[in-house]
Amino acid sequence: NKSCSLDTITAGSKLKIDRVPEDDQNLLKYFVDNNLMPNKSITVTKSERSLGVITLNTENNTDVVFSFEIAKLIHVTKF
């Protein structure tokens, strides 16, 4: 399966994280704290383009919400 950016994914998709941006230390800490690291599984629970936010459910069953701007920087592969 081909890697693509998270902002292109629809709700209900089960994914594996391939890459997260590492140049912003605060953002990287947020990803680590929320278990959003390469090879981790996530599910897109909501993709609200009109609001500009995407909601994920992580491996440890935590909901994480962030902007499409951030989602563009995360590369994923569909299961």
Q: Residue locations for each model-derived region?
A:
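Short, charged, intrinsically disordered terminal tails
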Residues: 68-79
